[in-house]
């Protein structure tokens, strides 16, 4: 009976540790999207969320962080009104020192219409995404983000 009780206690401690461990990569992913939001961009601590050799593969192109920041500047990201990402169906896999997360990302953006001054557009997207994170000095950071757009709807706001 004592052995069974000890086994149950150890099992719950292991599950609690596993949940905490799985929460750390998700916290990094959510922190990245928070730092990327127009309300916080450019975020002075983006390097807290990505590695020095970070790579994002989006729209059929590979971008380093500096390349992606230049792409955002070219898209006049600093004039956008709002950005929102809703992540769901996250699957977290852990290995020693690394994590992989696959998830569905639904995003909604409001920004000025580049072809019609004074008009705003609302863009709704759904992506299937995957990130690879590594643990650097006790902190998970995103090394690679793969994004495949599943749907995109753009509408003019009244």
Map each language-model feature to its residues.
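Short, low-complexity N-terminal intrinsically disordered segments enriched in polar/charged residues
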Residues: 2-49, 156-158
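A short hydrophobic beta-strand element
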Residues: 96-111, 126
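A solvent-exposed, acidic/Ser-Thr-rich amphipathic alpha-helical stretch
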Residues: 43-95, 121
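Beta-strand residues in well-ordered beta-sheet regions across diverse protein folds
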Residues: 57, 102-104, 143
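Short beta-strand segments enriched in hydrophobic/aromatic residues
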Residues: 50, 105-107, 146-149
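Short, surface-exposed coil-to-beta transition loops
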Residues: 84-87, 102-104, 122-129
């Amino acid at each position: 009976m004592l052995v069974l009780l000890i086994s149950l206690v150890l099992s719950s401690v292991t599950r609690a540790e596993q949940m905490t461990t799985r929460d750390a990569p998700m916290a990094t992913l959510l922190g990245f999207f928070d730092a990327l939001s127009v309300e916080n961009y450019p975020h002075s601590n983006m390097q807290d969320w990505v590695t020095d050799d970070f790579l994002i593969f989006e729209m059929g192109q590979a971008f380093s962080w500096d390349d992606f920041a230049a792409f955002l500047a070219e898209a006049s990201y600093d004039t956008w009104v709002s950005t929102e990402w809703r992540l769901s169906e996250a699957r977290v896999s852990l290995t020693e020192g690394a994590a992989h997360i696959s998830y569905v990302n639904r995003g909604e953006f409001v920004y000025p219409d580049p072809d019609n001054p004074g008009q705003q557009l609302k863009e709704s997207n759904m992506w299937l995404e995957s990130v690879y994170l590594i643990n650097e000095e006790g902190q998970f950071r995103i090394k690679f983000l793969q994004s495949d757009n599943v749907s995109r709807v753009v509408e003019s706001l009244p």
